[in-house]
């Protein structure tokens, strides 16, 4: 078992040394091979299995290698097998691997049948050895295979090769956009426990202190800063101050009101007059607008102001915990299919999901991973009318930090989120009808 190392501050770059450009591993994949990436994005190892003859397929293909059937659904695999050969690449024609040489790779014969090529930990066991193959996302966001020793725990962040496939917060500088919520405060504590080097915590009005903010501010390596995602000037101020230092951004800011369409008396912008049913009433801002202003436009403001700085710094050094690696969006399982009792909140999160997919596409060439978190109902005042099970703030924070360590792209914490995801995959239209019943 590798012993976790203490978080260390990255060395200051010398001005006379070359600045590394963002380099990625080979990106091209066939459409069939993207199935491996889709599973790896969820932290799962899947291979194609023929529905007619049962043969497990590798590499991914359009027709069965044994019976030529085209019915090849992706199926979860245990990944157990035997490392039968290994080698170390000292010189590669690919610029990414040339910078990171030497690089260990090996040949694994799975118990399920196929023989495949996998990355090996730099300090892993030599062949022959029992291993467990897992699917991970590489720096380019594509699925790759890694063979871990069966009876040894490898800390990915402490391994020179596997560090490229994780977004572990150890030694990193993290921005949590909203520290006034229970989720934000739980995240700050877990990030510090995971070894984060610095945590900036956003808060709203200085005169309105929420419970827990004082305790959070007193923690070591924590700095509070004013951040209002509805105010472009506030976001620009934060971007100008720390945007060039953020390694991981976790957007926890959200507005949630349990309303459908008919429950709103208007959709006026801030300070306007909302008219409904022949009556008018002054409103500072209505609930639906507030949800969109934070959940969607707040994310857009962050992406436009801090995103470019993270992309430009993402190259870092090939050998160390430096440079931006991840952007985390706290969404909702309601983003997949609208939940009418929380209809406008669902719509705002669906808009944020679509925007985050655009952000992911723009961040991917720089190697910054965009992670979307889809929790079920959270145990707070805005979901108190919903029956259990609900997700606690600590459980959600643990899922976020776990997603960073595992390097996945999408995570669905909680029983409700897992059940809705399964039903949505089976038939989105049926789920829509079930939720509206």
Annotated model-derived regions:
Residues 180:
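Conserved glycine-rich cofactor-binding loop
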Residues 217-231:
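Rossmann-fold cofactor-recognition segment
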Residues 252-259:
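Conserved NAD(P)H cofactor-binding loop of Rossmann-fold oxidoreductase domains
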Residues 260-272, 278-289:
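Substrate-binding pocket helix/loop in short-chain dehydrogenase/reductase
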Residues 265-266, 282-283, 320-351, 356-357, ...:
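Catalytic loop of short-chain dehydrogenase/reductase
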Residues 303-304, 357:
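A short, exposed helix-loop element centered on a Lys and neighboring polar residues
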Residues 372, 380, 384-425:
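C-terminal helical subdomain
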């Amino acid at each position: 078992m590798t012993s976790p190392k203490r978080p260390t501050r990255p060395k200051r770059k010398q001005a006379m040394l070359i600045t590394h450009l963002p380099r990625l591993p080979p990106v091209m994949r066939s459409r069939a091979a993207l199935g491996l990436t889709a599973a790896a994005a969820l932290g799962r190892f899947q291979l194609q299995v023929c529905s007619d003859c049962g043969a497990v397929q590798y590499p991914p293909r359009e027709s069965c290698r044994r019976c030529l059937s085209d019915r090849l659904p992706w199926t979860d695999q245990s990944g157990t097998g035997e490392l039968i050969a290994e080698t170390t690449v000292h010189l590669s024609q690919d610029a990414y691997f040339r910078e990171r040489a030497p690089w260990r790779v090996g040949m694994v014969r799975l118990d399920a049948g196929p023989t495949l090529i996998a990355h090996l930990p730099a300090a892993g066991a030599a062949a022959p050895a029992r291993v467990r193959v897992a699917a991970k996302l590489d720096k380019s966001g594509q699925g790759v295979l890694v063979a871990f020793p069966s009876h040894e725990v490898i800390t990915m962040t402490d391994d020179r090769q596997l560090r490229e496939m994780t977004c572990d917060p150890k030694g990193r500088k993290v921005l949590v956009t909203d520290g006034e919520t229970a989720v934000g405060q739980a995240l700050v504590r877990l990030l510090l426990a995971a070894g984060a080097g610095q945590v900036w915590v956003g808060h709203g009005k200085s005169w309105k202190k929420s419970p827990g903010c004082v305790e959070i501010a007193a923690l070591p390596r924590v700095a509070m800063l004013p951040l209002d995602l509805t105010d472009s000037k506030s976001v620009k101020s934060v971007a100008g101050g720390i945007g060039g230092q953020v390694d991981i951004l976790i957007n926890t800011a959200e507005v949630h009101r349990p309303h459908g369409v008919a429950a709103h008396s208007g959709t006026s912008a801030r300070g306007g007059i909302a008219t409904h049913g022949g009556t008018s009433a002054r409103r500072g801002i209505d609930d639906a607008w507030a949800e969109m202003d934070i959940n969607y436009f707040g994310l857009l403001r962050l992406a436009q102001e801090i995103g470019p700085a993270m992309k430009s710094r993402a190259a870092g050094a090939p050998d160390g915990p430096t440079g931006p690696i991840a952007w985390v969006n706290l969404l909702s399982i309601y983003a997949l299919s609208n939940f009418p009792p929380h209809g406008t909140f669902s719509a705002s999160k669906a808009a944020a999901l679509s925007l985050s997919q655009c952000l992911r596409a723009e961040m991917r060439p720089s190697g910054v991973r965009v992670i979307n978190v889809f929790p079920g109902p959270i145990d707070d005042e805005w979901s108190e009318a919903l029956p259990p099970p609900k997700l606690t703030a600590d459980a959600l924070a643990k899922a976020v930090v776990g997603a960073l360590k595992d390097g996945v792209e999408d995570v669905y914490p909680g029983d409700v989120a897992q059940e809705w995801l399964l039903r949505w995959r089976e038939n989105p239209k049926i789920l829509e009808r079930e939720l509206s019943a």
